[in-house]
Every structure is written in C-alpha cells, then in structure tokens.
Amino acid sequence: MVFTLGSFVLVTVAVAFVSWLKTKGTDETSKDGYFLGGRSLSGLVIFGSLMMTNLSAEQLVGRNGQGYAAGMTAMGWETMCPIALTLMALFFIQKYFKLGISTIPEFLESRFDRATRVIVSFIFLVAYIVTMLPLVLYAGSVAMERIFGITALMGGNCFMATTVMCVALGIIGGIYAIFGGLKAVAVSDSLNGIIFIIGAVILIPVLAFIALGDGSIAEGIRIFATSSPEHLNAIQPADAQPPYIPWPMIVLGCGINHISYWCTNQSIMQRVLGAKNLKEAQKGSLLTGLTCVFCPIFLVAPGVIQFIYYRTVPAVSAGRHQHLPQSDVGLLRRSGSGHCCYGYSGSAHAELCTEGCHHCPYRMLWPDDEPSAVPLPVL
C-alpha cells in the first residue's frame, strides 16, 4: 500500500510539472490563450484530452457496474461514438471554425440572437454544476476511496472518506484549470491518457484474466468466453427492460444522444476549438472515434469478468457503482500500480476542468472587460 500510494503521488506531481513546462510560454492574459490554449493544440493532444473527458470517472465506474449487472449489452451506450465523432470531424468542426467561435453558445448567437446565447449559457452552467459535476466527483471519490482504503483510515466512516476524496479531487482539478487554463488541462489529459492506457486498457484486463484463470491468461480468456455466454450477448430484444438495452434504442436513442454530446457539448468542443488549425481538430476527432471502437474492452469487459469470477449478480440498484473499484482494488494492490490508480483521478480532473461554460455569462455581464485568466472554473 505504501508503494502504491507513493507511486500515485509521484505520478501526480510529475504530470503537474510536465504540464507546467509545456504551458509556461502560453499567453494566458487573453481570451484565446486562457480558454482555448492559445489555439495551439495538436491533434494528438486533442485526442488525449477528448478521450480523458469522455472516459470520466462516472463512465469508468458506471459502465463496469452495468457490465457486471447486465453483461456486454452495456457496450450499446458506446456503439454510436465513432459515427458521431466522424460527423463532428466532417461537418460540425468545419462550421464552427468558419464562424471563428470559442464556445457553443456563441454559435447560437450567430444563428439566433444574443438573448438565446445568454439563456443557453446559464442553462449549461447550472446543468453542469447541478447534474454533471456531483456525479464526476462522487464516482471518482468512490474509485479512489476503495482502491486506497480511505474508509479504514477514517475509522470506518465511509461518508467522511467519500467527502474528503470529493474535496481533494475538486481542489486538484481547480488548480489545473485556474492556474493553467485549457492548455494545461489538455496537456495533463494527454499524459493521463498514456497512464490510463497502461492501467485500464492493458494492465487491469490482463491481471483480471490471470486472476480468472488462476495464473494462466489463456485459461482466463477461455473461461471468460465459455462460462457465461448470456452475459456476453450484446444484442437484446426490442422489449428488453433495464438494465438491458433494447436494440432499437442504440440507433434511435443513443445515436441522437451521441451527436448531441460529441458535437455540441462545451466540455468536448472546447478542446477541439483550441486546435491550431482545422486539420489538427479533425485529426484529434477521428483518432478519438477510432479509439472508441475499442472502448467496450476496458469499459465493460472488466465488469463481466468480475461477474464470472464471483458468479452472482447483485440487485440492479444496490451499490452497482462499487463493482469496478472493488474488482480493481486487489489487482492494483497486488501489482503495486499506484500510477494506474492515477488514471481514475485523472479522468475526474478532465471532466472538472472545463472553463468555457462560464465564459459566455461572464462576457454577457461584463462585455467591455476582456478576461485576463479570471479564475472562475466550474467547480
């Protein structure tokens, strides 16, 4: 545990230091410098930032919980991502770049009027504070609390442990956003993405298969493929009930939802609009779409592996969010991989550090004041 915690802290400091080195020359006294990283982001940086924003803490914890309870049908939520990202690269980004906007509400002003921009800006801001951020903080705190055993350190008080982790994640995410702007957030997201790939995409599935096969990865894969075929069925009938996903919903429901999320969500588009040019923005979007094809492997499969390992399905509403951190805690502790645990906190930071939502209301209230790195991140 000491080595795990130590490596976690070391990686956290290293990522912060590298992010500072990469951003210290950026002019953050201008609107574009602070909110859009000086419009200097490359395609690879955008790709890493988009992936970490999408694979936020509530996705990591929630999708694996769904995989545990319902099987591979949970991958239906991710199926339409590549299509939505392709549409974003081919159509939406070109329109946004042509208009030269820095936030989505600015597009609404050009399409409708100033009042629409103000109303939508405040709706986005309130929705982000009330609905999105609490989920991100809670899911991230659950994962970190279970992996590091914070409850035991606080005398068994789970509420206090979760609260402390929520506050810690919020403070760290706020530091990145306030003092670094979007470029620092994007650079740290890219580094987090590398760490996440090492941990969530490679290490955790491999260790899980080894545990399932009692030391043999080949045996683990065989057991995974043969022990519970119904849990590997990703296509459900049209009248399937929750937590299962009816197949028509994947196209008619998830498809529309993904277009809305990827093409109009400020936390997504802020990264894309910070690109140095249209080509880099499209490159980052298409790379993200390609990677999303493989998301079910590390978002859903670990939950299915845990179901096969324990051979029991919990009540659908009874603590399903605990399954991912519980299954990972033993794997990560055995490997001493605190740097992989950092992937969970990094995914939460990526979602927390979206400053652009407050930019539009700020400009509406003080139209003559060019923002000079005003520290008002949505936290």
Language-model features, listed with the residues they occupy:
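Membrane-embedded helix-loop-helix hairpins and adjacent transmembrane boundary segments
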Residues: 1-379
